[in-house]
Amino acid sequence: MAVKFHLCLLLIILVGMGAHVAFADLPLCDYPYGACFYRADPCPDDMPVECPNYFYCPQQTDRCCCYE
């Protein structure tokens, strides 16, 4: 039973690390570049550029809006 638990825990850790590695090449969407906003909301007027190809947001429901 303990072996199954440890294997399951290892699988969860590896999947979590794999999801993080997918974004490792992109920097975090944060000041001074921009900020993360909910996908359904428009980007604010002072950050009108949507830039998901250059920065990533930790929440999958968010997108990155950048300064001009």
From Swiss-Prot:
The GO terms describing molecular function are: toxin activity
Q: Where is the signal peptide?
A: 1-24
Q: Where in or outside the cell?
A: Secreted; Nematocyst
Q: For this UniProt entry, what's an example GO CC term?
A: extracellular region
Superkingdom, according to UniProt? Answer: Eukaryota
PTM per Swiss-Prot/TrEMBL: Contains 4 disulfide bonds.
Q: Does the keyword Iron-sulfur apply?
A: no
Where is this protein chiefly located?
A: secreted
UniProt KW keywords = Disulfide bond, Nematocyst, Neurotoxin, Secreted, Signal, Toxin
* Protein's job: Induces neurotoxic symptoms on zebrafish. Has also been claimed to be implied in calcification, but tests on homolog proteins suggest that proteins of this family have a neurotoxic function and not a calcification function.
Family, similarity comment: Belongs to the Cnidaria small cysteine-rich protein (SCRiP) family. gamma subfamily.
This protein is called what? Small cysteine-rich protein 5
Q: What is the lineage of its organism?
A: Eukaryota, Metazoa, Cnidaria, Anthozoa, Hexacorallia
